[in-house]
Amino acid sequence: MLYEKFEYNINNLIGNFGLSKISIAVSGGSDSVALLYLANIWAEKNNIELFVISVDHNLREQSKQETHYIQNISNSLNRKHYSLSFDHQNNFSNLQERAREGRYDLMTNLCLELDILVLLTAHHEDDYVENFCLRLERNSGIFGLSSSNINWYNNIQIIRPLYNIPKSELVEYLVSHNIKWFEDESNSSDKYRRNVIRQKLAKGADYIRHRSKPAYREEFKGDTERSTAAYTSVGEEALLRGSILSLEAKFGTMSKAAIISQQLKTNKLIENELKPELISAIAEAVKIFEYGFAFLDLVKFDKFSNEVKVQIINFLLIIISGQSRAARFYSVEPILKLITQDVNFKNTLHGCIIKRIQNELLIYREFGKKLPESKILLDKSVIWDNRFCITKNQETPNCFVTHLSLEDYKIIKKQLDLEPLKNLSCKNHNAVLLTLPIIKILEKVIAIPHISYYDNDMWNFEVSFAPNFVSRFTHFC
């Protein structure tokens, strides 16, 4: 039965955490509505408080009805329901990705407020199959092709207990229990490659790997020769190690069953070999400093596999830049080639400066490119540049957090003790200093907490390096 499969999954994924409450994301579609009813049975059985969260993206008229419907279901189940709203600000560029990030920001922030550690989502078997096909078409490496049933976002654990349950079983469950759901009309549009794949697989047809239209291969602009070279230069090493991808997967057609088999093999290789290697590589070769820069030991780095090397570079770029997305492989590959040439260099990538200093790679935030916005310190704490948490320990009126300008630096230069930063950053202290948070009142710099600069003994601020790092493979609180 469906519930027994769900119960087995969720108990295995959550483990013995002794949770007293849990949250669930529900949109109104068949997948999440089925998840809500299954999770409700499980929560009731285990005496766990269930919080239902819906996000209205304000893009479809139907969304208001969906939210109202979920609220009614939640009330009937005696579960608390929270309706959140995503503001797209009439900016429709890259909307799907921004809406997804906005949705997870809203839901996980609410979880933090409610002291909830786990969020359930309704990703099912068909979603995993579609993702595998899409990533295959983008020539993803082994890490990109893998999937995970547990992810982290904003220090909230995202759990997918429907991972091995096809959509058809969820629909059958709803129909048999006379439960209605809403269909998103955009799911039937041929505008999105995902929908084309979904419709073919739903009819029992084989998946044919798409290879020609550049619209679906944006990162390579339709350049088949270039994309194939990039794919084999790094990804092939790990793929061949476990004979992960069959010839059909690389160049031909696959049935849904074959795709699931390939996905399981990929996940097994990641879990048993590459993920432990990645964690070891970060522990052995990476040093991250509270000033928001990092060093990579290239001697230790050299012993790891190419796929892991790509992940480490991207890990550092995300951490140091404060961005939420990884750099494309074809952007990282030139850096890897430069490293093998054993010469010092200085490059920019992903909002970072990458500088080789003998056997180490220094990575720090690029100053002058997309400078972070100033943040008013209204509350006790504020996150600035998606990297630093600044906390005030006293009432400080009209102060705000920003970066140090060259003009400000000239005014206070003689009062700054930069020797510790100079030593840690191998004499790159001036560049790093310009990327650190400072506190100002009007036009006056009153504090640079990282270097213990205060213009008055009454000020006291704490600062910590706390980037919102998101990864399917590693998590560090």
UniProtKB/Swiss-Prot annotation:
<dbReference type="GO" id="GO:0005737">
    <property type="term" value="C:cytoplasm"/>
</dbReference>
<dbReference type="InterPro" id="IPR014729">
    <property type="entry name" value="Rossmann-like_a/b/a_fold"/>
</dbReference>
<dbReference type="InterPro" id="IPR012795">
    <property type="entry name" value="tRNA_Ile_lys_synt_N"/>
</dbReference>
<keyword id="KW-0067">ATP-binding</keyword>
<dbReference type="Pfam" id="PF01171">
    <property type="entry name" value="ATP_bind_3"/>
</dbReference>
<comment type="function">
    <text>Ligates lysine onto the cytidine present at position 34 of the AUA codon-specific tRNA(Ile) that contains the anticodon CAU, in an ATP-dependent manner. Cytidine is converted to lysidine, thus changing the amino acid specificity of the tRNA from methionine to isoleucine.</text>
</comment>
<dbReference type="GO" id="GO:0032267">
    <property type="term" value="F:tRNA(Ile)-lysidine synthase activity"/>
</dbReference>
<dbReference type="GO" id="GO:0006400">
    <property type="term" value="P:tRNA modification"/>
</dbReference>
<feature type="binding site">
    <location>
        <begin position="27"/>
        <end position="32"/>
    </location>
    <ligand>
        <name>ATP</name>
    </ligand>
</feature>
<dbReference type="InterPro" id="IPR011063">
    <property type="entry name" value="TilS/TtcA_N"/>
</dbReference>
<comment type="similarity">
    <text>Belongs to the tRNA(Ile)-lysidine synthase family.</text>
</comment>
<keyword id="KW-0547">Nucleotide-binding</keyword>
<keyword id="KW-0819">tRNA processing</keyword>
<dbReference type="InterPro" id="IPR012094">
    <property type="entry name" value="tRNA_Ile_lys_synt"/>
</dbReference>
<dbReference type="GO" id="GO:0005524">
    <property type="term" value="F:ATP binding"/>
</dbReference>
<protein>
    <recommendedName>
        <fullName>tRNA(Ile)-lysidine synthase</fullName>
        <ecNumber>6.3.4.19</ecNumber>
    </recommendedName>
</protein>
<keyword id="KW-0963">Cytoplasm</keyword>
<dbReference type="InterPro" id="IPR005728">
    <property type="entry name" value="RPE1"/>
</dbReference>
<keyword id="KW-0436">Ligase</keyword>
